[in-house]
Amino acid sequence: GKSIIETVRLIMETGTCPKYEEIKKKKDPRKEFIEIYGVGPSKAKELMDMGIKSVQELKSFDEEKIESVLNEKQRIGLQYYDDILARIPHSEIKRHERYLKSVLKKIDPNSELTIAGSYRRKNKTSGDIDILIKANKKQIFQDFVQKLKDDGYMYEELALGDKKFMGLANMAKGKEVAKPTPCRRVDIMITTEKEYPFAILYF
């Protein structure tokens, strides 16, 4: 009809369509909720069914209401939502790498640490920091994670197993700093020398 012809003419003249641009700007609440760490499709639907329209609206709730809606890990995900979504510059990960290697060397000089993923592939930015430790004792992994916590480098624990740790780290190393840098998603995995070549490909 006439409106379609007008829309086509507008696109040809300006290269864009205001209505389309407006639609693009509107965020899909479900997609936005799923970006919160620990929130899956069913939880996202539950939040939408409650009438919550955005992450920003969810953040505006008081502490008691947030606790009634989200579990502990999801609350951490909401608190650090912007930090977790932010890309990490290659140069910043280099700083993490220097610190992490110095910590591991003090615990066990024979163990090795590699930052894998997009950092190892020389990408300009990364979504998180994937740390692979090559060591012959699980205790080294446990001591390493504990030292990161003691230093104040590891802000939040998201998951901890025998061979893998997931958390949020900050190069400011301590919550007492006036302006801490963004918290970064960090995954740490321990592997034996035999498993290492396969682990580096996976991680």
Model-predicted segments: where are they?
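Accessory alpha-helical DNA-binding modules that contact the DNA backbone or grooves
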Residues: K2-I129, I133-G167
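Conserved catalytic core of two-metal-ion nucleotidyltransferases
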Residues: D150-E195
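A short acidic, often aromatic-flanked loop/helix-cap motif at beta-alpha or helix-coil junctions
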Residues: F61, E195-P197
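Short, solvent-exposed helix-loop connector elements
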Residues: F198-F203
